[in-house]
């Protein structure tokens, strides 16, 4: 590359960096609301990448975290990389994430909320997708002063006297969720929920798509599949939460995906009903969106607009 062309490219890069800086400044100088995004099983903070810019452009701050064992914190079972896959070995290979518990997850959410406060946020709303509803609940149960709102997106959550896993045993959930057949190992044996994100089996990939993302573009879903990791700790679903008094005052919203084949709609309704019974002074607002489980990929703009309305 000659010097003149290099300078043109450098100038273009500087302009892009300046534009990015303007977006960041807008996010900080506008609304004092920050959304702390918490992903679900097998995902990472990257999964909010189509939602965050919309909220940033509207003037809101966002913090998307990687939970322990996920995203850049992921650890892979040794048998996962061997192809062709030894299915029997993969099904019994203990998960390197088996020792991660809900305290680890909740601590990561608290750190995310503290980062938002340190950046100037006067209002912090934690958004948990799917499994992510569990750690945002535990984080707010222990540190309610950090959170002004909790948003459950197609999520599971504990309530007093009932762990999140209890909702997986509901008749409609157990009968109609499509996710169970996609698990390739017994969670009790390996200590995790395991899927094969590198599978080339068309039937298996079709099963995952039906369960998680029936309405997501195939090209985008292929990219998502390359970013997913195979394991998610299972112990968190059996842990009971202890709720501080301040939790009852936190505004709660449940966004239910009406085409969800993973956390079926009736399960979301049951969680909301139990929350309202536990904390009648601050009822949980139930909002429906026509989407599969992976709403952040299927309907990112609609989801972002719903969240902006809660700021």
Q: What kind of region is each of these model predictions?
A:
Residues 1, 22-36, 40-45, 53:
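C-terminal segment of N-terminal export signals and the immediately downstream linker at the start
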Residues 5-26:
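N-terminal export signals
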Residues 56-90:
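Conserved alpha/beta-hydrolase
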Residues 106-122:
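Conserved acidic catalytic loop of the alpha/beta-hydrolase fold
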Residues 127-160:
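Conserved hydrolase catalytic core segment
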Residues 152-190:
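Flexible "cap/lid" loop of the alpha/beta hydrolase fold
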Residues 258-288:
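Conserved loop-alpha-helix segment in the C-terminal half of the alpha/beta-hydrolase fold
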Residues 285-311:
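Catalytic active-site module of serine/aspartate enzymes centered on a nucleophile-bearing elbow/loop
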């Amino acid at each position: 590359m000659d010097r003149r062309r290099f300078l043109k490219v450098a100038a273009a890069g500087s302009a892009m960096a300046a534009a990015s800086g303007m977006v960041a400044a807008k996010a900080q100088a506008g609304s004092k609301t920050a959304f702390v995004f918490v992903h679900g099983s097998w995902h990472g903070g990257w999964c909010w990448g189509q939602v965050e810019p919309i909220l940033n452009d509207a003037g809101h701050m966002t913090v998307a975290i990687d939970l322990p064992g996920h995203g850049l914190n992921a650890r892979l079972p040794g048998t996962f990389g061997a192809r062709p896959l030894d299915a029997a070995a993969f099904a019994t290979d203990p998960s390197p994430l088996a020792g991660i518990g809900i305290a680890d997850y909740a601590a990561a959410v608290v750190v995310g909320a503290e980062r938002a406060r340190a950046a100037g946020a006067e209002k912090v709303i934690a958004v948990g997708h799917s499994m992510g509803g569990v750690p945002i609940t535990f984080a707010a149960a222990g540190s309610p002063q950090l959170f002004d709102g909790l948003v459950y997106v197609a999520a599971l959550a504990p309530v007093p006297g009932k762990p999140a896993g209890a909702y997986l045993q509901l008749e409609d959930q157990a009968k109609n969720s499509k996710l169970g057949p996609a698990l390739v190992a017994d969670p009790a044996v390996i200590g995790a929920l395991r899927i094969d994100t590198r599978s080339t089996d068309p039937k298996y990939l079709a099963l995952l798509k039906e369960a998680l993302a029936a309405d997501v573009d195939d090209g985008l879903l292929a990219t998502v599949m390359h970013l997913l990791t195979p394991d998610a700790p299972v112990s968190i679903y059996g842990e009971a939460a202890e709720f501080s008094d301040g939790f009852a005052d936190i505004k709660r919203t449940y966004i239910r995906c009406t085409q969800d084949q993973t956390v079926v709609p009736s399960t979301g309704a049951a969680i909301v009903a139990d929350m309202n019974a536990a904390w009648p002074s601050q009822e949980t607002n139930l909002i429906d969106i026509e989407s599969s489980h992976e709403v952040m990929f299927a309907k990112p703009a609609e989801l972002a607009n719903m969240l902006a309305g809660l700021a």
